[in-house]
Amino acid sequence: MNQDHPECDSEELTQNSPETDPLKVEVETLRGEIASIKADVLRERAELENQRKRLIRDVEQARKFANEKLLGELLPVFDSLDAGLTASGSEPSPLRDGLELTYKQLLKVATDNGLMLLDPVGQLFNPEHHQAISQTEVTDVEPGYVIQVFQKGYLLNERLLRPALVVVAKQD
């Protein structure tokens, strides 16, 4: 620096000021790019984590409901076994005992795989699980309660597989 000529110093300062120093400009530009890249990396990590969680949830749902088609196709078999037990009466016989044992074993296997039987006699009508096919006037039952089940309903892992077909009590 020249103390005798201050105008020279201001010229040098202007050339080396932060606004015009190419290195400082480049450093600031690179810092901005680094910050942008860091933000992009964080967004990508968050997206990957969300995809991983979605995949885990989808696999869990697929596993939970993989038997839905098979169990749905077994419902008529349950209906037939139930009808056979009803038709055989209440008197014990080897045929009735065998039919009942088969029904219970099949139902146990199905319940172990998430199937739940809906037999709502005496319960309040629930439109999410029951389908009313008629209403009947009854004096000894509160209105809105199920008094007869024509066809049992089923849930699979708390999701409706088939509604129960029911008769509901109504007011006189």
Curated annotation (Swiss-Prot):
Question: Which InterPro entries does the record associate with it?
Answer: GrpE, GrpE_coiled_coil, GrpE_head
* Alphabetically ordered keywords of this record: Chaperone, Cytoplasm, Stress response
User: What's a GO biological-process term for it?
Assistant: protein folding
Q: Where is this region: Disordered?
A: 1-23
- The main place the protein resides is cytoplasm
Q: Which SUPFAM superfamilies match?
A: Coiled-coil domain of nucleotide exchange factor GrpE, Head domain of nucleotide exchange factor GrpE
Q: Name one GO cellular component term.
A: cytosol
Subcellular location field: Cytoplasm
Pfam family for this entry, one:
GrpE
Molecular function via GO: adenyl-nucleotide exchange factor activity; protein homodimerization activity; protein-folding chaperone binding; unfolded protein binding
Q: Quick check: keyword Glycoprotein in the entry? A: no
Which family, according to the similarity comment?
Belongs to the GrpE family.
Q: How does it assemble?
A: Homodimer.
Q: Which PANTHER family match?
A: GRPE PROTEIN, GRPE PROTEIN HOMOLOG, MITOCHONDRIAL
* Its biological purpose: Participates actively in the response to hyperosmotic and heat shock by preventing the aggregation of stress-denatured proteins, in association with DnaK and GrpE. It is the nucleotide exchange factor for DnaK and may function as a thermosensor. Unfolded proteins bind initially to DnaJ; upon interaction with the DnaJ-bound protein, DnaK hydrolyzes its bound ATP, resulting in the formation of a stable complex. GrpE releases ADP from DnaK; ATP binding to DnaK triggers the release of the substrate protein, thus completing the reaction cycle.
Sorted alphabetically, which NCBIfam families does this protein's record hold?
A: PRK14147.1 (NF010745)
Q: What is the protein name for this chain?
A: Protein GrpE
